[in-house]
Amino acid sequence: MGQILSNPIIDKEHHSGTDCLTAFGLCAMQGWRMSMEDAHIVEPNLLAESDEEHLAFYGIFDGHGGSSVAEFCGSKMISILKKQESFKSGMLEQCLIDTFLATDVELLKDEKLKDDHSGCTATVILVSQLKKLLICANSGDSRTVLSTGGNSKAMSFDHKPTLLSEKSRIVAADGFVEMDRVNGNLALSRAIGDFEFKSNTKLGPHEQVVTCVPDIICHNLNYDEDEFVILACDGIWDCLTSQECVDLVHYGISQGNMTLSDISSRIVDVCCSPTTEGSGIGCDNMSISIVALLKENESESQWFERMRSKNYNIQTSFVQRRKSIFDFHDFSDDDNEVFAITTKKLQDRLNRSKDNDDMEIDDLDTELGSSATPSKLSGEDRTGPIDLFSLEALLEAGIQIRQRPSSDSDGNTSYFHGASLSDMLASLSNAAAGETEPNDADDNDDNDGEENGKNENAKKGSKIEEIE
């Protein structure tokens, strides 16, 4: 399961936005893990407003062995996509394959990242207004699900080493599957990065032990039936089936007072383990994006009204689902206490009286492009030697991290990721306590990778296309 904290970091990134094609609400939380290794993209329109076409692009990237590759994907993938000739030619399916391959190539060109040992999953969607088309590209075990008529439809499938098609490629490339892991190490069979598993110079990118080449699934949009898309990392899918997640979104919509950001946040609450006991599910980083599919000239509020008018009979609630997932835990009869681990005030979570060592936590929803500031310690500013008790309090309670959207040289400001303040504090605390740096940062998908000397820019990829 990897190393975990004594208390989860519960401060959440919230992002939301809308235009004429889609609306979205995203929530990401570090949770029980020692660091945040997820990243994401939310871009309602890739093109200029004057263009005839309108393309929305969303993505979730779940890192393992570190956050570097996931962060690179989040900050660079849009600019990489726009440079592809297939994108300029309107070949949307091929451009996603080309983009994944080119991202691996660009990683190897980066002096700071070419020797990095991390990798990440990638599940992304393009929504085309002109073609009325939803396209999903997926590598790894993050997942994309479409809600259509209240039912879940898989827009991706998890790439696990035990799948016959994946195992055949692994073995043909002189790899092996042991304990359901690639070479006994990596728990997924496709990923961006992870160059240790892509070092066979005699094979193309699509033939390597681990490949970044995505599967492509296309869906012709019917706006009377197709409602929203969910993209999430395995921290969510380890706890919920696709249908259960769709049902929870519909349940949130039916409440009448929840935004998409609110619903995504509550789903994270549902999936965060109340304790580190049990099987380990609910102790991972969590990221989820809910993308509403808007009809022509439909506003987000009108979309909500249309969804509620469908009157689905949802036989679940956030509380019921949480209790079902963690049935080993003795929850309070008070439903307000069911989500205590992610909602309780700091002083309650630490079981301490209010004093100057407490830290006020808020959880504001920030729109795209808005600025935010870190939470501050209450009381007077502190100087002098490190107060280990205060550090432990910060680590156990979580730290509110706020950032402006990052911007790269291409002007892409759609990518956000958590700051590393918690990592710094953990390092300071361990150093002061005489502890050594953890030597095993493994994830459910952890592995180390090495630079691959060559990565051919092949155009091959699996494709599953629905014929409607």
Swiss-Prot record:
EC number: 3.1.3.16
One Gene Ontology cellular component: cytoplasm
Catalytic activity: O-phospho-L-seryl-[protein] + H2O = L-seryl-[protein] + phosphate; O-phospho-L-threonyl-[protein] + H2O = L-threonyl-[protein] + phosphate
Residues with Phosphoserine modification: 324, 332
PPM-type phosphatase domain span: 23-293
Top EC category: hydrolase
Phenotype upon gene inactivation: Leads to slightly impaired activation of genotoxin-induced targeted autophagy (GTA); simultaneous disruption of PTC2 exacerbates the effect and also impairs macroautophagy and the cytoplasm-to-vacuole autophagy pathway. Double knockout with PTC2 also leads to decreased dephosphorylation of ATG13 following induction of autophagy and reduces the association between ATG13 and ATG17. Double knockout with PTC2 leads to elevated activation of HOG1 during osmostress.
CDD domains per UniProt: PP2Cc
Cofactor note: Binds 2 magnesium or manganese ions per subunit.
Swiss-Prot/TrEMBL keywords: Cytoplasm, Hydrolase, Magnesium, Manganese, Metal-binding, Nucleus, Phosphoprotein, Protein phosphatase
Pfam families in alphabetical order: PP2C (PF00481)
Biased composition (Acidic residues): 357-366, 437-450
Note: Present with 19700 molecules/cell in log phase SD medium.
Role description: Dephosphorylating regulator for many key proteins. Dephosphorylates the cell cycle master regulator CDC28/cyclin-dependent kinase 1; its activity appears redundant with phosphatase PTC2. Dephosphorylates HOG1 at 'Thr-171', to attenuate activation of the stress-activated p38MAPK cascade; its activity appears redundant with phosphatase PTC2.
Classification via PANTHER family: AT28366P-RELATED, PROTEIN PHOSPHATASE 2C
The protein, known as: Protein phosphatase 2C homolog 3
Encoding gene (name): PTC3
